[in-house]
């Protein structure tokens, strides 16, 4: 049996019970689904193509800045206008094209800090309008990252929004503890090292507050991870996720070995064993952004370097002064090279996360 057998909707954007069943199946079968940050139709189809060819589910997500870029850099982001419109545009685009790839897709929004809550509000309003018309939210899930705030404010704000989301059977991802580095709206580059490791009690406090509302939530607990790539050693300790599972299991008194759905942030540069340790301890989603950005660049960079004598002018190249160069500078040609290398990176990650051939 594979993923398709446990889903009501086999292809395209999945929501509600299907999202919960997908993550449950992933946890039980010890694989994680990569979440790819998309900033354009090009990056979206690169991810969809890689997942299709690997017979895998995929998560596509927009960050606050990525959503604004999707809308167009010429649009003002005052009041989160561009980020709201861009996220909604990306969602509708992905909903329209994803079924053509024949795989299940989770449509997600990435880190939303306190100062970005107007963006979250705008997306939720779009969800509720879509729900009123179609009986399901526009997005499968959203993430609140209030890790800069006190745990009390973090959790209480998540509770407030989660009640609203639960009415649409929507998934919530939240972050407790600090992931190092910098991500849209949250900068923890100078965080104290001890703060980079979430404690079991913190995780249980989240579970205790959210589970009575709905079981549809996941927790990004910090274990020394950092967003982006940084020189020097990063002391990742994904094994501590087992302590979170054990503590919550004992507090709840449940028989389920891993009651928590966990998320791996800041995975750039992590080893295969570190990923596997996290996945074995309940990680069902791994964020991929920095590595994919660089992979996308490499295809375009190498194309430009290899074809430089064919793209210096519209006409004239080493084959002759009158030879046209349109087939070399056509964006459909060189952008495609970025899609190929980004797709190759995602394909490799799907293998690392044990997601390949899970459909």
UniProtKB/Swiss-Prot annotation:
It is an enzyme of class 4 (lyase). There is a cross-link at residues 27, 73, 85, 308 (Glycyl lysine isopeptide (Lys-Gly) (interchain with G-Cter in ubiquitin)). It comes from the Eukaryota. The active site is at residue 110. Its EC number is 4.1.2.13. Zn(2+) 1 binds at residues 111, 227, 265. GO terms for molecular function: fructose-bisphosphate aldolase activity; melatonin binding; zinc ion binding. CDD domains: FBP_aldolase_IIA. One of its GO terms (cellular component) is cytoplasm. D-glyceraldehyde 3-phosphate binds at residue 63. Keywords: Glycolysis, Isopeptide bond, Lyase, Metal-binding, Phosphoprotein, Ubl conjugation, Zinc. The modification Phosphothreonine is found at residues 11, 150, 179, 290. It catalyses: beta-D-fructose 1,6-bisphosphate = D-glyceraldehyde 3-phosphate + dihydroxyacetone phosphate. Its cofactor is Zn(2+). Pfam families: F_bP_aldolase (PF01116). Binds 2 Zn(2+) ions per subunit. One is catalytic and the other provides a structural contribution. The keyword S-adenosyl-L-methionine does not apply. Dihydroxyacetone phosphate binds at residues 228, 266-268, 287-290. InterPro entries: Aldolase_TIM, FBA_II, Fruct_bisP_bact. Homodimer. Catalyzes the aldol condensation of dihydroxyacetone phosphate (DHAP or glycerone-phosphate) with glyceraldehyde 3-phosphate (G3P) to form fructose 1,6-bisphosphate (FBP) in gluconeogenesis and the reverse reaction in glycolysis. Present with 1020000 molecules/cell in log phase SD medium. This is Fructose-bisphosphate aldolase. It comes from Saccharomyces cerevisiae (strain ATCC 204508 / S288c) (Baker's yeast). The gene is FBA1.
